[in-house]
């Protein structure tokens, strides 16, 4: 525990083109070696391509793709006695966004298309249609949580460590077995 006051999370400046903090965070996750302008041009180009394909606005299409990749539950390792259990826990909203964006960027980097903008556009397009590597990753995480729901009663161990975070206990669990 820190002896001094707990520092709050820094506010991120909204994206200059669309005014979205979520998109600014996405640009930061995509950025390599501090080259923000390069990351922004890749994201804007990918969103333009995505908007042309979907017929929606750039931000709307991005939000749909992100929503389809956001996980609701994940597993955390908890040591009880001599055994380690994979305990399903609900994912907090900020972490949902962070995981979804990270998975989309990772999946786009692994694709074999010509440019990064095209790879990102294709991955976002696949995510909007509920297919693709990032959506598969979310389904794998959900499948792991479902397979380990027998250990959900150990959840109090993981909640105890998150009790200092606001809203940890006020939210309803995403799945019934987390009650």
Swiss-Prot record:
GO biological process: cytoplasmic translation; negative regulation of translation; ribosomal small subunit assembly; translation
Primary role: One of the primary rRNA binding proteins, it binds directly to 16S rRNA where it nucleates assembly of the head domain of the 30S subunit. Is located at the subunit interface close to the decoding center, where it has been shown to contact mRNA. Has been shown to contact tRNA in both the P and E sites; it probably blocks exit of the E site tRNA. Protein S7 is also a translational repressor protein; it regulates the expression of the str operon members to different degrees by binding to its mRNA.
Gene Ontology cellular component annotations, sorted alphabetically: cytoplasm; cytosol; cytosolic small ribosomal subunit; membrane; ribosome
Pfam families: Ribosomal_S7
Assembly and oligomerization: Part of the 30S ribosomal subunit. Contacts proteins S9 and S11. Cross-links to IF3 and the P and E site tRNAs.
Coiled coil: none
Record key words, sorted: Ribonucleoprotein, Ribosomal protein, RNA-binding, rRNA-binding, tRNA-binding
Descriptive protein name: Small ribosomal subunit protein uS7
Organism, as annotated: Escherichia coli (strain K12)
CDD domains: uS7_Bacteria (cd14869)
A molecular function GO annotation: rRNA binding
């Amino acid at each position: 525990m820190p002896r001094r006051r707990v520092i709050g999370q820094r506010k991120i400046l909204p994206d200059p083109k669309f005014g979205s903090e979520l998109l600014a965070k996405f640009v930061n996750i995509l950025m390599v070696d501090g080259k923000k302008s390069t990351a922004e041009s890749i994201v804007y180009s990918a969103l333009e391509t995505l908007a042309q394909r979907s017929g929606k606005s750039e931000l709307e299409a991005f939000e749909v793709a992100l929503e389809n990749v956001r996980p609701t539950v994940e597993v955390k390792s908890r040591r009880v006695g001599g055994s380690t259990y994979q305990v399903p826990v609900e994912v907090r909203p900020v972490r949902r966004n962070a995981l979804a964006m990270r998975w989309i960027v990772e999946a786009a980097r692994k694709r074999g298309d010509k440019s990064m903008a095209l790879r990102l556009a294709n991955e976002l397009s696949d995510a909007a249609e509920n297919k693709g590597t990032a959506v598969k990753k979310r389904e794998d995480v959900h499948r792991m949580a479902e397979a380990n729901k027998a250990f959900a009663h150990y959840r109090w161990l993981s909640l105890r460590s998150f009790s200092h975070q606001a809203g940890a206990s006020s939210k309803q669990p995403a799945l019934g077995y987390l009650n």
